[in-house]
Amino acid sequence: MEKKDLRIVYMGTPDFAVESLKRLVEGGYNVVGVITMPDKPMGRHGSVLQPSPVKEYAVSQGLRILQPEKLKDEAFIEELRSLQADLQIVVAFRMLPEIVWNMPRLGTFNLHASLLPQYRGAAPINWAVINGDTETGITTFFLKHEIDTGEIIQQVRVPIADTDNVEIVHDKLMYLGGDLVLETVDAILNGSVKPVPQESLIRQETELRPAPKIFKETCRIDWNKGVKQIYDFIRGLSPYPAAWTELCVADGTRQVLKIYETEKVFASHEMNIGDIRTDMKTYFQVAVKDGFINVLTLQLAGKKRMNVADFLRGYRTSDNNKVE
């Protein structure tokens, strides 16, 4: 079979999914349909509809687009079936019902942003950085009933530097993911795929780390942890959705403070956890049990994101100021 004869349906929504679709199109594959989320109401009163990044790219390429509200809707199922896909590819989309992923003769594969079986779930990149991992990766695997558990097709390992935040790791994986999707389709086309069950990669001593969805309360900083854990937590949520805390000032008021970039300072001290140390010009540090978190970039509620020097120009300190 030639590339142009392989009928592919692609499913994805955010920026992360655009690169893989782009590689398929530029690689000469026949993408007969793109499934993405419905346009999102934006602006005042939801008067403006914002298409997904995948839709924007698909429109620019003249690809056929389907935007179902419900993936089990009979009209959508019939339209999807009419595309006569040989293969479906899923990148950062939704959980698919079996009637959808079982439809094409060559199956449906997913690109997942971790080295499966580690970090099954919705936020694998965040959790790898939060946990201080020095390596992550991307995996292509065939879908089956249980989420993120199907047989592995291919994997690529990617280092995580100590200074990488989640945005940097996201972008590394996004571009390498495009390569891996293309390599996986090539392998399926030439019949060289030998899928590996995830169970065969799990040893008795293996600790499987989950990657659950991240909510606002997940992002609250626990200052009772150590310097390294807090540092990794902040970069694992930067720039989005952003780690946050409450800044408590002398008059008893509290303000939500998002923290984007920090440095580790290991030191002995006699300050209380959460107390603030600052010269009011160049540094703003939070005391933790084994040192300080030196805050470099931050944002008060209702204000723009700024560096610490700009923040300190408008900041008033007292002995009672702290974060918690």
UniProtKB/Swiss-Prot annotation:
Q: Which domain of life is it from?
A: Bacteria
List of residues binding (6S)-5,6,7,8-tetrahydrofolate:
114-117
Enzyme's top EC category: transferase
Provide this UniProt record's keywords sorted from A to Z.
Answer: Protein biosynthesis, Transferase
Keyword Transferase attached: yes
Xref: InterPro entries: Fmt, Formyl_trans_C, Formyl_transf_N, Formyl_transf_N_sf, Formyl_transferase-like_C_sf, Met-tRNA-FMT_C, Met-tRNA-FMT_N
A GO molecular function held by the record:
methionyl-tRNA formyltransferase activity
Catalyzed reactions per annotation: L-methionyl-tRNA(fMet) + (6R)-10-formyltetrahydrofolate = N-formyl-L-methionyl-tRNA(fMet) + (6S)-5,6,7,8-tetrahydrofolate + H(+)
Q: Which GO terms describe its cellular component?
A: cytosol
Enzyme Commission code = 2.1.2.9
Q: Where is the signal peptide?
A: none
State the SUPFAM superfamilies in the record: FMT C-terminal domain-like, Formyltransferase
HAMAP family (alphabetical)? Formyl_trans (MF_00182)
Q: What does this protein do?
A: Attaches a formyl group to the free amino group of methionyl-tRNA(fMet). The formyl group appears to play a dual role in the initiator identity of N-formylmethionyl-tRNA by promoting its recognition by IF2 and preventing the misappropriation of this tRNA by the elongation apparatus.
Q: Which family does it belong to?
A: Belongs to the Fmt family.
Give the protein name, as stated in the record. Methionyl-tRNA formyltransferase
Encoding gene per record: fmt
